Amino acid sequence: MEQHLKSIPLQDDTKKKGILSFFQNTTTVKSNKFLTKEKDVITLDDPKEDVSGPMIETVKQETMKSINKECADEMKTTPKKANAEDKLLCYKNSPIQSTKYDRNTNKQVPNGNIIAIETKSRSSSPCSKRELSSSKKEEAKREKELKKQQRAEEKHRKELLRQEEKKKKELKVEEERQRRAELKKQKEEEKRRKEEARLEAKRRKEEERLKKEEEIRLKEEAKERAQSRIGNFFKKLSDSNTPVVEKSDYEKFFLPFYAKDGVRVSNKWKLTKVELEGSKRKIDDELLNSKDKTSSDDLLNWLQSRRLPRGHKIKRKAVDVLQQMPLKEKTDDELQSLLAQVPHKYIKFYENVRPPFIGTYSMDFTLPPNDPFSTKGTGFNYDYDSDVEWVNEEEEGEVDNLESGEEEEEEEDDEDVPSEGEFDGFLDSEENSDLDGLPCAKRKFVGPLIPTICLKSNFENLSEENKRYLQQLKAEVIIETDGPIDPFKEPKTSSLPSKRSNSDLQAQTASQSQSPEKKQKAMITDPMDLLRLFDGVQDSTFSLGTVTEIAQKNLPQYNKQTIKNTIKEYAIRSSGKGDLPRKWVIKDAQNWENLRANANMPTPSL
């Protein structure tokens, strides 16, 4: 402390007031004097003058009080920068007001300029300042930490309030959103119910309308069917002025379906337009309203539950009915009712000529998915074509007329008109009923037939009845000729007279003159159309009706009856012996080639 006092000069500062400003008379330090250790006094003007006496103690105490007070004030404002040295500098630089004392009388002398400060009292001041400064610092530090803690608590409290306010606001927004969603859902549900009610009413109206239309259509079909039956007895004159309505390709290839008597068209999977729209809208609503995975799974399960199983379980089999048939306590009506419970099959294909299969089928088996055409364990044989053995080529003319929409000419049955010499054999058998004077009676066989061999050497030992029977089975020569027959030469024309008598010729001439003139059949005469017909018929394995329909698609200007007559006239169907299929073949191949040569058409590749 004393060293600092030696090194600090006294500076002149007239603007700042010192700690001794409470004295009345103030003097400004004009000289820069230093504090000396030997005298321990502050010399201002006259170094010889000094102050002593009891007033020095008073001045010292008052000075220390002022210094302590000023230091305390400065510590409150700037606690980090205040220290003992600064206080001394403040004390040094402040203007000093002094009072001069008389040495001898020890009285105060006005306007004095010497102040004496004892070294002992001055040396005790820095320690108290340091302690005061450290205590102030600690107190200030505690106050600072306390304020910091208070600020942190205040901040935490505000944060909690803010979060609570935010949660309340979010809860309010969520409640508002749920309320709006519930209101929207109620509106959609109400709208859906109204839409379903509207669709249901519309569907009922549509069903009633379709029912009325179906009744009207059935009445019209029955009326047209009756008119067509009546119209078949009369020949309708063709009107050349009637405009021909050309059909589109779709109408030519896809003919309208005609339900026969006893046939009902199934509409199990048929939905009206209104029902289809309602079903689609229902599924769309389920998909749109499902927000979580659970709803989606429920929808998938619902769709799978709507899938119908394949096939139907057979409740009663034909074997069970057959086992109950020998029982005597069952009546015919009961057996018929049991038989009606067995499922029946009606199988018909477009290409087949023979009637469709109608019967029971109760075999229970499952086809393998990797080989659905397998016939193992089924008893089926797809290689066998039962249609080949069917020879009857009669067609249902009524159905064909209804499908084609044209009124065809009535086909005359050529087989009803006896041909020339057709009944000669029957007349001969009647005339020659007695062979060798013995009646020819039909033999009746009772029991199974046993094959036997009869040699010619034993012919005389047979009975007369067996002789007559074997006489009918003997071989006869058709053409009597001498020597071998050369197959590479033309046979000679025989000039033998006709076996038929003149009376037979006269009777035939008379019968022809009496019979009415035979009606000529309508056939195709255009060479180009004939060539197109022959190309489609040659080597075809279809029946006559199917070939006629196929040819009519290529020749729509002719009706079915005309095409059928032309096919019968120019083509014949092979017998199909063995494994060979029955094919249509043109009778006169040379005529076919001549037509092709005249038309300059290339030969089709077979």
Curated annotation (Swiss-Prot):
The Polar residues compositionally biased stretches are 493-515
- Similarity annotation: Belongs to the RLF2 family.
Keyword check for Oxidoreductase? no
Ranges of compositional bias, category Basic and acidic residues: 128-212
Q: Oligomeric state and partners?
A: Component of chromatin assembly factor 1 (CAF-1), composed of MSI1/p50, CAC2/p60 and RLF2/CAC1/p90. Interacts with SAS2.
- Write out the entry's keywords from A to Z: Chaperone, Chromatin regulator, Coiled coil, DNA damage, DNA repair, DNA replication, Nucleus, Phosphoprotein
**What InterPro entries does the entry give?**
Cac1-like_C, CAF-1_p150_acidic, CAF1A_DD
State the compartments where it is located: Nucleus
Where primarily located?
Answer: nucleus
Q: Specify the superkingdom.
A: Eukaryota
Phosphoserine occurs at 94
Q: What else is known?
A: Present with 1590 molecules/cell in log phase SD medium.
Q: Which GO terms describe its cellular component?
A: CAF-1 complex; chromatin; chromosome, centromeric region; nucleosome; nucleus
Coiled-coil residue windows: 128-240
- Protein's gene: RLF2
Q: What does this protein do?
A: Acts as a component of the histone chaperone complex chromatin assembly factor 1 (CAF-1), which assembles histone octamers onto DNA during replication and repair. CAF-1 performs the first step of the nucleosome assembly process, bringing newly synthesized histones H3 and H4 to replicating DNA; histones H2A/H2B can bind to this chromatin precursor subsequent to DNA replication to complete the histone octamer. Plays a role in the maintenance of heterochromatin.
Q: What is the name of this protein? A: Chromatin assembly factor 1 subunit A
Q: For bias kind Acidic residues, which ranges apply?
A: 393-434
Among the Pfam families in the record, one is Cac1_C
- Phosphothreonine is found on 78, 509
Protein source organism: Saccharomyces cerevisiae (strain ATCC 204508 / S288c)
Region Disordered, as annotated, extends over: 116-212, 393-438, 483-520
| A GO BP annotation | nucleosome assembly
